[in-house]
Amino acid sequence: MKEPMKDRAKELALDQLVKVLDRVPLVSSVKNDLGELRSLLYLRRPPRVVALGLGSSGRSTLLRSLIERRPVRHPLDTDHGDWVQIEHEGAKVDWLEIDVDDPAARSQWTHALDEKVPDLVFLTFEPRNVQDAKPIAERAKSLLADLPDGAGALRVFTLLTHSDLIGRGPVEVEAERRVLEAALEECGLDADPPRAVSAISGHGLAALSEAMVLALPEETRLEAARALTRAQEARLRIGNEIVQACTSVSVTVGVTPIPFSDMVVLGPLQALMVSALAYLSGRGLDKKTVAEWLGSLGVVGGLGMGLRFSAQTIAKLVPGAGNVIAAGVAGAGTTAMGQSAIRYFLKN
């Protein structure tokens, strides 16, 4: 219960920031940047993933390997046929497993769609299922045809699981993958080319994680990148998007001729930026973390940020070019703070 309350408080803080900006001249161009931040940060929700396949095709093991921070003694609770809200050490995923050979598969799928529409699909095959891939894919294709009007086509990731059990090396794995690909093409399933993955060795999971984040809707990307521990490129990309959006707002605020508007707007905005980057990394922004981050800046970095704030406030008191100087200082200060947070939270 505490986390939704914190999220609501942050959303209200962003709303207050928008109201402040509404009273400041020359900020209409900033609404797009704030809209992007709202979609990414406060309209965020967990990704919804449906895993179709046979009961022994390694779906739960795959999920655990995708989101796991450290080994756990007990398996994740992934009941078949119903949506399950997985929460594991900060990772959040709405997960649905359906066995396509189960007589109840159709009714389970229909009931699940009444609850929520998935964002993407896993269709899993273990090596011993490859020879029977066509009927499995045809059952999955039949289920996917039941998506409600307006839902759009779902991105389907076909996965050859337990790839570490195939032959003696990558040549045999690729040969098996091609057999699976041919079977899927024959049945006409609209899906990505099969990916060979292993929950044990981790083979293929980094590329799968990155592809998942790219395929997901905007409002799920932050939670997805946070959950998928191997999606390091996605985390950096989203982190830089957050910094760029906040920098754009900072520059616009810096252009305004009102002294000390930086204190009203830039402080909350930069706090929002750093807390978002910490959240993206999977870490909380408590006092200890803040102290460690500030310590990582060093004396020069900390003084530099303080001097930037003083300079941009003083510059606004200078007629004419002072606002331009303040805008440059505000943007540079926000960028520097954001990049230092990226280095600490996302690159360490």
How should each PLM-predicted stretch be described?
Residues 335-348:
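Hydrophobic alpha-helical transmembrane segments of membrane transport and translocation systems
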Residues 22-30, 40, 48-51, 201-251:
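C-terminal-of-GTPase-core extension/linker across diverse P-loop GTPases
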Residues 62, 122, 258, 274, ...:
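Residue-level signature of catalytic and energy-coupling elements of molecular machines
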Residues 152-157, 162-225:
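Canonical P-loop GTPase G-domain recognition
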Residues 2-96, 275, 284, 339:
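Conserved G1/Walker A P-loop phosphate-binding module
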Residues 231, 298, 302, 341:
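Flexible loop/N-cap segments at domain edges
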